[in-house]
Amino acid sequence: MDNTERSSNGNIQAETEAKEEKKNIKKESVSLMGLFSAADKLDYFLMLLGGLGACIHGATLPLFFVFFGKMLDSLGNLSTDPKAISSRVSQNALYLVYLGLVNFVSAWIGVSCWMQTGERQTARLRINYLKSILAKDITFFDTEARDSNLIFHISSDAILVQDAIGDKTDHVLRYLSQFIAGFVIGFLSVWQLTLLTLGVVPLIAIAGGGYAIVMSTISEKSETAYADAGKVAEEVMSQVRTVYAFVGEEKAVKSYSNSLKKALKLGKRSGLAKGLGVGLTYSLLFCAWALLLWYASLLVRHGKTNGAKAFTTILNVIFSGFALGQAAPSLSAIAKGRVAAANIFRMIGNNNSESSQRLDEGTTLQNVAGRIEFQKVSFAYPSRPNMVFENLSFTIRSGKTFAFVGPSGSGKSTIISMVQRFYEPNSGEILLDGNDIKSLKLKWFREQLGLVSQEPALFATTIASNILLGKENANMDQIIEAAKAANADSFIKSLPNGYNTQVGEGGTQLSGGQKQRIAIARAVLRNPKILLLDEATSALDAESEKIVQQALDNVMEKRTTIVVAHRLSTIRNVDKIVVLRDGQVRETGSHSELMLRGGDYATLVNCQETEPQENSRSIMSETCKSQAGSSSSRRVSSSRRTSSFRVDQEKTKNDDSKKDFSSSSMIWELIKLNSPEWPYALLGSIGAVLAGAQTPLFSMGIAYVLTAFYSPFPNVIKRDVEKVAIIFAGAGIVTAPIYLLQHYFYTLMGERLTSRVRLSLFSAILSNEIGWFDLDENNTGSLTSILAADATLVRSALADRLSTIVQNLSLTVTALALAFFYSWRVAAVVTACFPLLIAASLTEQLFLKGFGGDYTRAYSRATSVAREAIANIRTVAAYGAEKQISEQFTCELSKPTKNAFVRGHISGFGYGLSQFLAFCSYALGLWYVSVLINHKETNFGDSIKSFMVLIVTAFSVSETLALTPDIVKGTQALGSVFRVLHRETKISPDQPNSRMVSQVKGDIEFRNVSFVYPTRPEIDIFKNLNLRVSAGKSLAVVGPSGSGKSTVIGLIMRFYDPSNGNLCIDGQDIKTLNLRSLRKKLALVQQEPALFSTTIYENIKYGNENASEAEIMEAAKAANAHEFIIKMEEGYKTHAGDKGVQLSGGQKQRVAIARAVLKDPSVLLLDEATSALDTSSEKLVQEALDKLMKGRTTVLVAHRLSTIRKADTVAVLHKGRVVEKGSHRELVSIPNGFYKQLTSLQEVL
């Protein structure tokens, strides 16, 4: 599209207001109920069942303490009637086993239902979010979406939402149920104690609420910081060839590192808030204990209750308070999910009714003739309010072909966009058969149009599916007929899998001509009344253009056709040519009429003339006919595109990608990677150890009080209980600093670890050779997913969980020591049951490990589908392919959704089983205590102290093992991380013992070079290629599509290494030279220049980071870019937009040339640098290139042969060999020569 129209001066104030509005929007979070707005009837049933299971599960612990209290009362009075009381203890022990079964079933139901509904709802959210994005009009993508992170919301944000909807809701319900059940039982037992505790609860709630609010705010800011870092990574990896060519790896890593520093600062604040929040909560609970113990002793001494009831009430109330504290992390996760959900729900909520009306409202016509009229149309792009058209009027007669030509920025492509109703006129009307297109049903209207653009957007699916986008319900016969009409059937059938061949991300498996013919087949299948050709052959070489043009000629018959073309040879036979300049019609007429006038059109044509060859047309015509069928297979076989078919990829994956790492080795690697944070880990561990030791000592205090309650002397009860109450109050004072120490330093360690993992990953990714990026599994979407999701999993599942593990380890060691000290028999029996708990959780871990891998990869594939659709939104909108894309996205999500049922039940069963075995252990232990007391082998006080601390130990073991799912996920994420970190690149940019390059003369020689792409080793690109360009000279490489032209440049840049032979620069094998220092002497200008989402100034400076402002401006002047830059309102500070979208093709190319000028290279590599430009832009760019080429060794690949006539040497490639070599004049004099035939195809006159 002509982007000059949008590169004019923008309304800065409007953009500023939009940014402020976005900032305000980002601060929002959805309501708690809003999280579940994607639920259907089955989800409501699952949530109801899961909620019931979670609540019952939570209530079993308070009920456990009821039976426990009865058993304690029996044990305390055992001496009165040993036989009867022992029988009562046995009965209550059996009741505990029954309660354990209830716990087992409820835990199973709760975990499985919430895991399943979380997966289902999030999958639906992802689908609805993508549907809403695809339903937006193009203006949204030009304005609001330019700086947003749409893909981030569908991947990372969705994971946070799923976590909140699933596991964390289950946890919160369970803990809240435990809290409520504990207080209810407390009121029924000793209402005075419970009522007193209610006075403390509001303080705990305020502390927890404040903590949740602070964490929500910090997490929102942290999410934004990580999204910015992800955007940097995505931009770099999507343009990795440019980054490598300009030795920009270090700058990219530095930029990524700076983005991560913002998140690290927020992480410190998060740790501080977490430490203070959790510490304050536990401090209040300890103080509550002190108060309750003192008041309970008062009630016991005055005969208001007995020791067992008092103790049961205290246990229920206190453990219920602990449950409230344990719910805090899950509440924090839900708060994060609410923040993450805001962007997702806002897109869904604001779009559905609006988009539905926009697409489906309006009238349809019975018959469409195809007459199009522009009546006094005025238009300005929403993102750039300068007028493109003012009162533009013209008429395109039905069934006729109209071509629009003109300089860059004249509005050619804008006409095609407006005909498709991507934009609405500011004033005036666009009519179809006399009807304003605004009044027509948009979906129906676009079905009447068929679009073929310059760079056809193909999707990462089969050829058949890509053609099927043209007509949703077409059958295979219709697809084949459309392919035949587009001259595509023969080359498709020659492919290994025919119409089921995967085309790869962006269609990278196919050559330009093949992609274009598939796009034409897509348009043919649609059988449109109106055909729109937007520079449909401008990026093709002469041979491919001839075949594609024949296909277009077939399709254009009897259809209204609008053509925008840079190559004027393609529009010579159209019915009428419309010449645009400055948004106005300057000339209209046929080719011959306009040539006779000698106006703008004639000037453009003269610029494109090549040397006429009188006798070559018939020769080439015959040659093309013979090659039309066979050349297609050659183009696929030797395509310069670097990706392979997916079936080949599966066979040729690098060994390193298959390498498995054991969990222990990965954990050890992680520890080594985290070595700089060991001091933080030590300080955090001190806090965790102290926090862990508090709990068994706390249990000892309780047991001490319990013993005192059964004392017959009131003074003893008063003295002992007050002593414990004072100790607990003191513990409350020191608890806050202990938890602050633990959580602040562990969070700091985790944040620094994830920053280091992300940075190490990013650096490792950028050290790999280009061939590695060509693998489908290493596409940009997958790599950004590893950087974001997997690095986050490593931190949350391992670093964050380490805090809990150390705390519980301290707790377990302290508890076991105390238990064995007081009663080794009781401790031995209860401890003997622990292996059962561990075995149950290990079974759960093994099953989780089996399902997790496919689950992770499926999300990556789905994200790639979404990313591709959003990147090609104009094609999606033009073909009304929203439904097909959504169905493909749904298909990619279906596997993890189906697995959620199985994984949920396995996880729930494993966790429920561990809970059941825990209750059985307690029942066995209490029964055994009664036996020992009955046989006088221990006393009540010692056995209860031993048993109490073991209860706490069992809970800590269960809690630690409950972290198994998160740890397993983190371990799997570590596998992805270390597979990248441990991979040895095939082409090292800093090879040891390589020779530094300080100066390059520029003599380049290919010596018997053979080459195959690493992803498709069975296809030869070059066989013993010999080619040389002398220092300071220029070499033009031409040939049919797939002959290896661009591969020559790829090898010189050392994106790939030859399979055999040598590539030498100044007589030195390129493999012996330091790659970074060599690339600093080379400059690459590509067909589609890769600009970064920063200012024009910074894009030029990318060529030389040490350049001064004056040098940058001089480079821009040399590239004929200075004039258009200073005309912009912000001049050199103008933002180029994502991938340079705010600039026209010619402007982008001149900025890229300025970047190359600033590099001051010894060798210049031009890969089709002007092929995608219109004539006016090409002239300016060619002038800049001519200046740049002087005195430099230059290798240029060009489709337009007029651009290479001045080259010192022209080499013609065919089937991987040089078939002709010489100057332009020498080669055109060879009768029936390859070069002569190629030039004849591009004659205009």
UniProtKB/Swiss-Prot annotation:
Composition bias, Low complexity: 630-646
Gene3D superfamilies: ABC transporter type 1, transmembrane domain (1.20.1560.10), P-loop containing nucleotide triphosphate hydrolases (3.40.50.300)
Cited Pfam families: ABC_membrane, ABC_tran
CDD domains: ABC_6TM_Pgp_ABCB1_D1_like (cd18577), ABC_6TM_Pgp_ABCB1_D2_like (cd18578), ABC_MTABC3_MDL1_MDL2 (cd03249)
Name of protein: ABC transporter B family member 13
GO MF annotation, one: ATP hydrolysis activity
Family to which the UniProt record says this protein belongs: Belongs to the ABC transporter superfamily. ABCB family. Multidrug resistance exporter (TC 3.A.1.201) subfamily.
Binding, ATP 1: 406-413
Keywords, sorted A to Z: ATP-binding, Glycoprotein, Membrane, Nucleotide-binding, Repeat, Transmembrane, Transmembrane helix, Transport
Glycosylation site positions: 77, 351, 391, 778, 1008, 1106
Membrane topology: Multi-pass membrane protein
Residues that span the membrane, as ranges: 48-68, 94-114, 171-191, 195-215, 276-296, 314-334, 686-706, 725-745, 805-822, 828-848, 913-933, 947-967
Region called Disordered, residue ranges: 1-20, 610-660
